[in-house]
């Protein structure tokens, strides 16, 4: 039987962020000025850390990522690049003497580059026709996998060469677009020789195949791995196209022999996502695996190959794993996963399957690398603090190594974050995060916001977001409460799975329970409570708008689903709606699906809408089409309800450009303040 043994106890249930001087106001401009720390890489000798810092430029409406190097103790941090474009995918090689990275060449095409560890002697070493999206050096550093795109299918100009200026698309099958781009090109892994100064003899591992690897939209180099002998590689692929691709999550791990081109399916017969291979120095292969085809939010298990046998190491672990890496001695697999409203670091003893927590507190951890045998490097953030680099040893408190965001964050007010347990209608206790404004006075009354999470199965952990930033909401005078309602990971598979086929069921009861619970707090102004959310959170807002019974004074929905029938017929990931809604709207004998379209469809309750609503969308959102938002806005205005729509022609499911982000935040608080601070 597995168990969790916390080696580090959180010192208190509430964390306070306090500025040393008079508090500054946390404005959208300040939020969008913060440097964004990511991708800490430990040098081979364990003495240095390489990391990136992306800095937005509000005036130019873009951002630029530069590379930094510091000692393993956080001292002597030096910026080693200062360029017009972003350096990405930076890794050490030649024992830490050099760094390889991706950067555009003089033609603007992203390529692989190398430089000395101090940033000098930059040289472009690849000559790909199209942008490279990432690369992985082999263990002997004599080969490299490069990810670039290849043409997908036949273009209109292929069919009609004389119509060179037509922009019409001829579409015969699914999935013709995905998330925020049309499927005109797909990624392939190319393997080639590398002598330290030039990449040659590149070969497309999937030459002639219309399969993608890594998998869109989230997949990167974590879906590629080398075997220790540098003679074989592993890639992740869902070898399906068209409709079969659109309804399936059945990916596999494939081992590819470079010399012969022979390919072996390592996960044959495993039906869900098989992903993110982690190979130990001796060649042990572990990976993340989901059980069910079509269920993208299934429990992510850790599997390991034992000869030809596939072993589930997490059969007794009831939580979904996000990230894995081997310890240097191969006795442990370290992993990060949602757990009770946070994202701690755990390790599993491979021999006896026992699990222990090695880094926790009210934080989320992001990535993990070893510096020697027992020192680990990671990034950490929370609702109150942006990402920074930390080091820790098992049994010791993490040590902060970078302070990129401190000059701004140290000027802000004393926002508090508390964990509150709220009873639900079915007798459970629901973990809810509550953020209190600066200079909080329990004797005063505050407007409040119910934060509705998206996903629908994404954790309400201690995330730091540059879009849905809960701290800036609290800094603007709101008590923010974020429930881990039914359907969120981190509380066992039963809690996570309950939402499937039941969008309007217990998860909505959980939201209403949280609202009612918070209204009983003496510091909550019960007449000025709002509900906000994006994606499934935006859907939740639409559903609550027709079923809240006067609980809320205003709503805000970003990229939410308004019409479930239309969503089924216009979205791209058909596996998603098949699993979550139960099936197609024309499948009249499918009671689960019929219940979804009958009881869970927000448009069925528009006649009950009576509350002001702000809706936001991006025209490049192919996950939840902007037409959903337009329907909701039109319905609200036709019913005489105060409403506003903010539409971004160039944005997708998220708002990413700095000036668009600032506009989003300004309209967000303008709307909330108008209706909740009267």
Where are these regions (language model features)?
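Cap/lid segment of the alpha/beta-hydrolase catalytic domain
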Residues: 241, 293, 404-527, 534-535, ...
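Predominantly five- to eight-bladed beta-propeller fold
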Residues: 64-65, 146-208, 236-239, 243-252, ...
